[in-house]
Design a protein with these regions (language model features):
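Acidic/glycine-rich phosphate/pyrophosphate-binding loops and surrounding catalytic core
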Residues: 85-128
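N-terminal export/targeting signal detector
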Residues: 1-4
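Compact, glycine-rich, soluble single-domain proteins
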Residues: 6-98
Length: 128
């Protein structure tokens, strides 16, 4: 009997990943969540952070989105998803700079500032 389940990461432009895995860690506003096979059904919101597939050592930077787990299928719908292997120091610095300028914009709502602060801290963590 396999301990694997299906995970899909989908952006508006394309499917980033469709794979079988043993465990996925996702960033949510409730904290980091570990998903294993036969997890209870779940719907939650993504915060900017890192999605990790433990058995494949794959990691993806994601921004906001939704997560649904049902019948051993994990569906991650996100505005942005990038493999950490594809991000370099310069591109991360550019993303941080853009987010910091958006954060300093006085027209941003508190909710938007909250999301941007998560994004900036995650990008800085990746960039170390």
């Amino acid at each position: 009997m396999s301990d694997k389940f299906t995970v899909e990461i989908i952006t508006p432009n394309k499917t980033i990943l469709k794979a079988e895995t043993n465990e996925v860690t996702i960033p949510s506003y409730e904290g980091q969540m570990g998903i294993l096979k036969d997890h209870i059904p779940l719907i939650t919101f993504l915060r900017p952070g890192i999605i990790s597939l433990q058995d494949q050592e794959k990691k993806y930077y994601v921004e906001e989105g939704t997560v649904e787990f049902s019948n051993n299928n994990l569906l991650i719908l996100t505005s942005t998803a990038r493999s950490l292997a594809d991000l370099n120091h310069s591109s991360i610095e550019d993303l941080i700079s853009i987010a910091e300028s958006q954060l300093s914009d006085n027209n941003s709502s508190d909710k938007e500032k909250y999301k941007l602060s998560y994004k900036i801290s995650t990008l800085k963590e990746i960039n170390q």
